[in-house]
C-alpha cells in the first residue's frame, strides 16, 4: 500500500491540530489509513500529513475535488492552498 504525503500551510497550528479526528476521517474517506500529522520544526505554519492509501486514484480525486464535508473541514481547520501531494513509488 503506497504512502501519501500531503503538505500545505495553515492559518494557526494549534487550531489545525485540534481537528485531528475530523482530518483523519476525511483522509480515510479517500481510502487512507494510519493518518499521521507533522508540524514544521522551524515553527512556521507549514504542516504535513502522511497516510497509507489503498486507492491512489480515489485519494487524488478527493484532494482535487473535495466533497462539501471535506471542504468544510479544511476551512474549519484553517487550511491554506495550495496543497501538494507526494505519492510513494
Please name every model-derived segment:
Residues 1-89:
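Short S/T/G/P-rich N-terminal loop/turn motif that feeds into the first structured element of a domain
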Amino acid at each position: 500500500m503506497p504512502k501519501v504525503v500531503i503538505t500545505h500551510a495553515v492559518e494557526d497550528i494549534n487550531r489545525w491540530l485540534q481537528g485531528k479526528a475530523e482530518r483523519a476521517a476525511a483522509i480515510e474517506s479517500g481510502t487512507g489509513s494510519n493518518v499521521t500529522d507533522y508540524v514544521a520544526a522551524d515553527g512556521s505554519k507549514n504542516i504535513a500529513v502522511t497516510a497509507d492509501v489503498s486507492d491512489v486514484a480515489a485519494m487524488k480525486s478527493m484532494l482535487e475535488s473535495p466533497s462539501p464535508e471535506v471542504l468544510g473541514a479544511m476551512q474549519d481547520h484553517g487550511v491554506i492552498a495550495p496543497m501538494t501531494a507526494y505519492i510513494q513509488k
